[in-house]
Amino acid sequence: MSSPDGGYASDDQFHGNCSVPIMMGQYEWTDPLTMFQDAKTKKEAGSANSRGKAEARIRRPMNAFMVWAKDERKRLAQQNPDLHNAELSKMLGKSWKSLTLASKRPFVEEAERLRVQHIQDYPDYKYRPRRKKQVKRMKREEEGFLPSADIPGPQVMGCNAMVGQNYKMQYSGQNSQQSQITPAGYFEDHNPVGYYYRGYNVPEYYMSQNSSVTCGPPAQGEYQALSYNFNSSYIPYQQNASAPAMGKQMAVKENIIQESPEHGIMGCQVSPQMYNGQMYVPECAKTHPVAQTEQHSSLHQSQQMVTQNYLPSQQDGHLESDIDKTEFDQYLMYEPKSDTELIYTIDQDSGAYSTNLLPSLISEANSVCYYDYCGV
C-alpha cells in the first residue's frame, strides 16, 4: 500500500540525509548570507584596528592659533554654511593676524599650559611627521604619474611621425587613387639613392698620358668599358718596337687603299677579333716583345685575307684621282692600322712618343656598333 503522503516525505528525508552528503560531499557549500556577514565582521574589525592605531598615535599639543580657531571655526561655519573649509581657514588666518597681542595673550597662555601638560604625560615623546611627501613623490614617479623627459611627446617628435601615419592610412584605404601628394618631411628620414650603391664599383675608362710601361693586371672596370671581349692573341708591339716594322705596316695600309679606292662606309664588315685587336690594349701586355713580334705578323696576314675577301671585285680607276686619302681616316674604321700606329704617335717637333688613344677609341666604338646594327 502507498503511504498517505505519496512517498514525498520519505524521499525528502532520504535525499536530505543520505543523497547530498554522499554525492556532493567533496564540495564546500557556503551560504551567501554567511559570506556577507563574514565580510561585515572583517570590515568592523579593520575599522576598530584603525581606530586603535589612531588612538595610539600621540597628537602634538595645540598652539595658540589652534586654541583660538577651535571655537572660532565653529562660529564661522554656522554663519557661512556654504563656504568650503579652505575658505574658512583663509578667513581664520586673516582674523588671527588682525588681533592685537593683548587679545592673543589668553590663547598663548592656554597653549603653554597644554604644552607643559603634554610633556608630563608623554616624557619620551618624539615628533614624527605624519606625511612623507618625498616618499609619495617617488612612488608617483615609479608608477608613471609624472611624465618622463626621456619619452618624447607628440609636440617633441614633431609632425613627421604623425604625417607618416596619416600617409600610410590614406594609402591603405585608398588603393584606387593613382596620384597622391607626398607629404612634407616624409622622405627626410630616408637615405638617398646613392647610399644603397656605395659598395658597387662604377666602371671607369681612363688612360693617362704619363702612364708607366709596366703595370699590374688590368682592373675589372676596364673590361666593362668595351662592347666585345678582349682577345689575348692580338697583342701590340712594345714602345721600343723597331722602325722597319712600322714602315712595313704603313706600306700595307697604302696598298690596301690603292687596291680598293671606292671602299667606304658601306663596303665591308669588320670581324670582332680584328676590332678587339686594334681597340683594346692592356698595358700589362707590353712586357713581352718576343711573343708580340710573332703574333703581329700573323695578325696582319689575317687582316689582309679578310679585307681582300670583303672588297668588291670591280674597281674604278678613274675615281682614284677624285678621292682624298686623308678623308678615309675619319670614316673607315676597318682599315688595318698597326697597333703601334694607333697607340704611339710621333711628335714632329720633339720626336717623342705620345699616347692619345681615347678619342679615337670612342669614335671607332660608336661607328662600328652602328654599322653592325645596320647589317652592312
From Swiss-Prot:
DNA-binding region, residues: 58-126
Region named Required for transcriptional activity and interaction with ctnnb1: 327-331
Keyword Cell inner membrane: no
Intervals of motif 9aaTAD: 326-334
Keyword Transcription belongs to the record: yes
GO cellular component, one term: nucleus
Annotated InterPro entries: HMG_box_dom, HMG_box_dom_sf, Sox_C, SRY-related_HMG-box_TF-like
Major subcellular location class: nucleus
Record-linked Pfam families: HMG_box
Assigned keywords, A-Z: Activator, Developmental protein, DNA-binding, Gastrulation, Nucleus, Transcription, Transcription regulation, Wnt signaling pathway
Domain Sox C-terminal: 259-376
Any one biological process term the GO annotation gives: Wnt signaling pathway
Record's subcellular location: Nucleus
Gene3D superfamilies assigned: High mobility group box domain
Tissue specificity as recorded in UniProt: Expressed throughout all the deep and superficial endoderm during gastrulation. Expression then declines rapidly after gastrulation, however a small patch of endoderm cells behind the cement gland maintains expression even into tailbud stages.
UniProt free text on domains: The 9aaTAD motif is a transactivation domain present in a large number of yeast and animal transcription factors.
Record's subunit section: Interacts (via C-terminus) with ctnnb1/beta-catenin (via Armadillo repeats); this interaction is required for inhibition of wnt-signaling.
Protein name per Swiss-Prot or TrEMBL: Transcription factor Sox-17-beta.1
This protein's encoding gene: sox17b.1
